[in-house]
Amino acid sequence: MVNPKSELFEQHPDWAIHDENREIYYYRNQLVLDLSNPKVQDYVYSVIENLMKENPDIAFFKWDCNSPITNIYSPYLKNKQGNMYIDHIRGIYNVMKRVNKNYPDVPMMLCSGGGARCDYEALKYFTEFWCSDNTDPIERIYIQWGFSQFFPAKAMCAHVTSWNKNTSVKFRTDVASMCKLGFDIGLKDMSAEELEYCQTAVSNWKRLNPAIMDGDQYRLVSPYESNHMA
């Protein structure tokens, strides 16, 4: 993403996906960088590389595709506009190949507010997908059931959040523990008992990690056919 009032856009307006001859639509006051352009790929990689050089202890990256592509025109592709979507995604993968090669031990989540950017090629470069911004544990049961039809549990990032406080922290944690467990919740708002339970749950998840992440999966009870699932 690039802000039209940024130094980057002022210096390289042709690096953004847009057609100067048409009214430009801004999503979150931004445009999408044209990753079909090798120069843009080099720039994006350099940003990550500089971050790692300046902060070698970075332990995690979240790559968030926070905008649909709206202004459908690539200044770089010129008369090959039919290639734009494909070449743009290939450009993302070219960047990720370099990141993965040079920083293989840094896990990376691919996010799009949901599963819109999840595919098998991306599994080569990202350690996990953010399945949905909907973290209601009841609805996540259906999301994770469906997502697991196509991707393994280790590819699904599942976080305990404050969404749907009508459910217990235990229930929220149990649902998230089916996948790659994480927490996006204010610890100061949790009781001592809840904190103690979560600490125990994390220890158990780590102990059971080989089975959860790499074990064989058997579908026993569908949430679509019952009020529980297994």
For the regions a language model picked out, list residue spans one by one:
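Glycine/alanine-rich phosphate-binding loops at beta-alpha junctions
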Residues: 1
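Short, solvent-exposed polar/charged micro-motifs at secondary-structure junctions
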Residues: 5, 119-120, 225-229
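Active-site neighborhood of glycoside hydrolase catalytic domains
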Residues: 7-170, 174, 180-196
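Glycan-recognition and catalytic regions of carbohydrate-active enzymes
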Residues: 184-230
